[in-house]
């Protein structure tokens, strides 16, 4: 609650509720409960702000991150054909999370940090199924992760291939987040902006991690790099990923207010 409140004070328009890899801690059976509770807290912060300010431009996005297993890659280098999880099992796992987020009151579903597009397709399939069952029309955002200088996701897709893979699904936005800082992500978001007619998003890390895994890029440095995206008019939605704090969000929001969003 304190984190959401701090970010809201820094003019964050979209509050993200998130959880990741519960199975690593033997807590996967609580997936629905964690996501329901997290979404409920974020919605309470949103409602409190909107009631106090009489404003309604704040949204809660339910963040659906990567699992600790991939459908396209083998965890065993000696058995490249092996898969640690099936598509159907992923759909079932994602369904629990999606149900928790929706029941908790999110306004948007945000499938993010996608390094394996087949996993993302399982998440999107689960979302579509639940939307049909509940007769809901909730917006869906998608955000991939370019893992290195090759310009590809971990499962080997380029920007263009990634977009084509999910272009059959009605989406609010397509973007990139995590792994890279704002300066490294810029060329890939440019390519994305040129080939999609949906809104685009970017949530970079605060630079690259240092030798201790911490992020040293200051809020001022990051906001200056984000301004390059705004000057080139290639994004509609902007935020931060690893290493970003409320101060980063505040300065990014201040810079973004001076520019119009990308036209589609």
Give residue ranges: language-model regions.
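Short, acidic/polar
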Residues: 85-100, 154-165, 218-229
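N-terminal small/glycine-rich loop or linker at the start of catalytic domains
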Residues: 17-25, 53-89, 136-153, 198-213
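Catalytic-face loop-and-helix region of soluble metabolic enzyme cores
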Residues: 147-154, 166-237, 250-262
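Active-site-adjacent beta->alpha loops and helix N-cap segments on the catalytic face
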Residues: 115-135, 181-196, 245-252
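Catalytic beta/alpha-barrel core
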Residues: 90, 94, 107-116, 172-180, ...
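Conserved, mostly hydrophobic/aromatic
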Residues: 42, 101, 109, 174, ...
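Single conserved hydrophobic/aromatic residue that forms the stacking wall/gate
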Residues: 1-11, 15
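Glycine-rich anion/phosphate-binding loops
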Residues: 25-44, 87-95
């Amino acid at each position: 609650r304190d984190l959401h409140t701090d970010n809201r004070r820094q003019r964050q328009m979209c509050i993200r509720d998130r959880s990741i890899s519960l199975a690593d801690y033997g807590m996967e059976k609580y997936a629905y409960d964690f996501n329901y509770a997290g979404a409920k807290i974020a919605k309470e912060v949103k409602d409190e702000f909107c009631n106090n300010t009489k404003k309604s431009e704040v949204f809660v996005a339910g963040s659906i991150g990567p699992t600790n297993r991939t459908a396209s890659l083998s965890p065993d280098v000696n058995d490249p054909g092996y898969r640690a999880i099936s598509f159907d099992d992923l759909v079932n796992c994602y369904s629990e999370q999606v149900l928790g987020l929706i029941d908790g009151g999110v306004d948007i579903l945000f499938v993010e940090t996608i390094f394996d597009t087949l996993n993302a397709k399982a998440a999107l399939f689960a979302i579509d199924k639940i939307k049909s069952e509940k007769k809901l029309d909730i917006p869906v955002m998608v955000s991939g992760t370019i893992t290195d200088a090759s310009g590809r996701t971990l499962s080997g897709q380029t920007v263009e291939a990634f977009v084509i893979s999910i272009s059959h699904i009605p989406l609010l936005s397509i973007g990139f987040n995590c792994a890279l800082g704002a300066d490294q992500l810029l060329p890939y978001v440019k390519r994305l902006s040129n080939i999609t007619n949906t809104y685009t998003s970017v949530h970079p890390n605060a630079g690259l991690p240092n030798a201790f895994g911490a992020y040293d890029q200051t809020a001022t440095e990051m906001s200056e790099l984000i301004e390059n995206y705004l000057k080139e008019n290639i994004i509609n939605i902007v935020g931060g990923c690893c290493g970003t704090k409320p101060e980063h969000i505040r300065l990014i929001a201040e810079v973004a207010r001076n520019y119009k969003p990308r036209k589609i």
